[in-house]
């Protein structure tokens, strides 16, 4: 809602109890405060929170500012990362690149970026009881990486193919 300007869409989405609000490239303190209030209302039993969704691929492709991911996380909000894969502003579905951009351009730690792309993404789509983490009763959707020193290498080795294998429902995906 705030891809190019703050149009008040964050507050509207929170008031309407939308599950998520995307395109937060322009996201100031008022918008962040509105998201905090939405989380507090949800914790008080007033519906689900409105998840803030960053789309760093759009920022990269359009050369516009990045969502203030660090400020959103520091405010205690569950940042979500997504691709917004479309031919106009984000012609890529590469989630590894999204995680890298969040780490390199939004001030998000690699471990936070992975959580934003998995756990928080599943929560924002209301499927966290099925996917988003490796847990008993969840579908086994995950990736194996090539050998790395640690999760920080995903961002540091920003041009390397770090994913070795993809598993969907516990089966190797050959796609």
Regions found by a protein language model. Give the residues of each.
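Histidine-centered catalytic micro-motifs
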Residues: 1-2
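C-terminal cap of metal-dependent C-N hydrolases
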Residues: 139-175
